[in-house]
Design a protein with these regions (language model features):
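Bacterial Sec-dependent N-terminal signal peptides
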Residues: 1-23
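Contiguous, structured surface segment used for ligand recognition
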Residues: 20-153, 483, 495, 499-528, ...
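Flexible loop/turn segments at secondary-structure boundaries
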Residues: 54-55, 164-166, 192-198, 263-269, ...
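Active-site neighborhood of glycoside hydrolase catalytic domains
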Residues: 269-275, 279, 284-390, 395-408
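Flexible, acidic glycine-rich loops studded with aromatic residues
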Residues: 374-380, 385-390, 396-537
Length: 537
């Protein structure tokens, strides 16, 4: 019996050692530890077999220098000796797929594209950081990693409409996405509380629409009056700054998807150009959170001229295939009372105001399609009918995504109870001294995020409609970037693992690897939330 017990203990220890060698987040498809180690030092180089790989190689070297102190150089001529990191493109692999082979002689990394190589380097970055050594020498354990993502769309959304974040802060957000192999940055640029992007044809959007007179303090209910801080608040991105951010993201293989929310969430635009509203104002940039009854008028041609003018400049700034046009939380009260909207309903043979919104969205989609772009919209675009070519972002629950999938639309799953990273992170916000969050009732610990199943209740054919997942960071109660990081991390890692490792998830193993990744968060100076790491849910 004693002999059996000893064998059991030996097996457990052996397995734990093997598992401990995998430190990569998100979890790779296949990880096999090998015998031995390879030494990297200041003489080691990153050899690129294709000029297109200089960029990801250079980024990798900057990561290793900042996080480990080890200075590596990039070369295009084949070097001799050991400790070489060799990068190449293998067209037989999928675009985002990579193979990483660490041997005693060196490191060989192949990707299906530049992007695949970049993801392999993000994995190697984590491996090197956790390896023994210092700025002079690092010993990396030998291993073989075969990896590719399950979902092609893996997104992170940042709302800069409620609170503004600087160019450097947005770039840091992008860096966080890149570390987790997130490949879409959904940039929520316009809101009732502020218009955040320069549109040259409509200068009042930033002259007037980017600044609110004051901001709501704390919460309020229907039984109490809102309290304001009395301080003007504003900010916007110039077009040159937008180009800089898009370039920065592109260098990290992240597609920036701009969102111009319409027809609702447009009070800042209405304050800038009152003639675009059903009542023609006066309007002011909204000081309080919540949903406004005032939305763009769907009955006047002037509204569509405005939208096309704005989107023409957006198209020029963002090379993304997708443009997000919102479509959420658009009350129909003003449309019901607006003679122009009612006339439009009659002339177009529409059934009601929901079909009027469908007309509105389809018309905008047609304009974007003429410029080679596709739309994403929040799941409200399903109401009143939606074109088959629209991609639906399901936020009000997985059932909305299921509905869209059954209709044949492409779907991005981002349901509130799994993916809204502005929610509280523990069961007792006060006891755990959590900062302000969107909902005091809704709790979203990292375990809950990790449990998301984007395919739930879908058959094999319907599953093909689900193109990915996304974590959303709304900022009504997040006034600065330090707070934003606290809400984002470590829960974004769970979103990333759902998107990348859907077929290979294991929460216990995720927890172990996250305790390793936490050290890299510390080194990068990220202000992550501590609850999960302290065993608090």
């Amino acid at each position: 019996m004693k002999k059996v017990f000893c064998l059991f203990v030996a097996l457990v220890v052996s397995l734990s050692v093997m598992a401990a060698e995998c430190v990569i987040v998100p979890r790779p498809v296949s990880f096999e530890p090998q015998k031995g180690k390879v030494t990297l030092n200041s003489k080691s180089v990153v050899y690129v077999t294709d000029k297109s790989l200089v960029r990801p190689a250079t980024l990798f070297c900057s990561y290793v220098a900042a996080e480990k102190g080890l200075q590596l150089s990039v070369v295009e001529n084949q070097p001799k000796g050991k400790g070489v990191i060799s990068l190449s493109i293998d067209k037989s692999l999928a675009t985002e797929e990579y193979l990483l082979d660490v041997t005693k002689k060196g490191v060989v990394l192949k990707g299906g594209s530049e992007q695949g190589v970049f993801y392999g380097l993000q994995s190697l970055r984590q491996v090197v950081f956790h390896s023994e050594g210092n700025a002079k020498k690092v010993s990396v354990a030998c291993m073989t990693v075969k990896d590719k993502p399950h979902f092609g769309y893996r997104g992170g959304m940042l709302d800069v409409g409620r609170y503004f974040f600087s160019v450097d802060e947005v770039k840091k957000f992008i860096d966080i996405l890149a570390l987790h192999k997130i490949n879409r940055f959904h940039w929520h640029l316009t809101e009732d509380q502020g218009w955040r992007i320069e549109i040259k044809k409509y200068p009042n959007l930033t002259k007037v629409g980017s600044v609110r007179k004051a901001t709501q303090v704390g919460r309020y209910s229907k039984r109490t009056q809102p309290v304001y801080d009395g301080k003007p608040y504003g900010g916007f991105f110039t077009q040159d700054e937008v180009r800089d951010i898009v370039r920065y993201a592109t260098e990290r293989y992240i597609d920036v998807i701009p969102e111009i929310d319409m027809p609702g969430h447009m009070v800042a635009a209405l304050a800038s150009y009152p003639e675009l509203g059903c009542t023609k104002g006066p309007y002011e940039v909204r000081k309080m959170w919540g949903i406004s009854q005032d939305i763009l008028c769907a009955g006047r041609e002037q509204t569509f001229e405005f939208i096309e003018g704005v989107l023409s400049e957006i198209i020029a700034l963002f090379p993304s295939k997708y443009i997000h046009i919102g479509g959420d939380e658009a009350p129909k009260h003003r449309w019901k009372e607006c003679p122009d909207c009612q006339k439009r309903i009659q002339e177009e043979g529409l059934k009601d105001e929901h079909e009027l919104q469908s007309y509105f969205m389809k018309r905008v989609e047609k304009f974007l399609a003429q410029h080679g772009r596709s739309i994403i919209g929040w799941d409200e675009i399903l109401e009143g009918g939606v074109s088959k070519t629209a991609t639906v972002m399901a936020w009000r629950g997985p059932n909305r995504g299921i509905m869209a999938a059954k209709l044949g639309n492409k779907v991005i799953m981002t349901p509130t109870r799994f993916c809204y990273l502005d929610y509280c992170q523990t069961s007792d916000r006060d006891a755990n001294k959590e900062p302000m969050a969107m909902s005091l009732k809704a709790k979203l610990p990292i375990r809950k995020v990790y449990s998301l199943d984007p395919y739930d209740q879908l058959n094999e054919e319907e599953r093909k409609a689900i193109i990915g997942v996304q974590g959303n960071l709304w900022t009504e109660y997040i006034p600065n970037f330090k707070h934003a990081q606290h809400m984002l991390l470590p829960r974004l890692a769970a979103i990333a693992e759902v998107g990348w490792s859907y077929d290979n998830k294991d929460f216990d193993d995720f927890t172990r690897r996250m305790h390793m990744l936490r050290k890299l968060y510390d080194k990068c100076g990220y202000n992550y939330a501590p609850y999960f790491f302290n065993g608090i849910e």
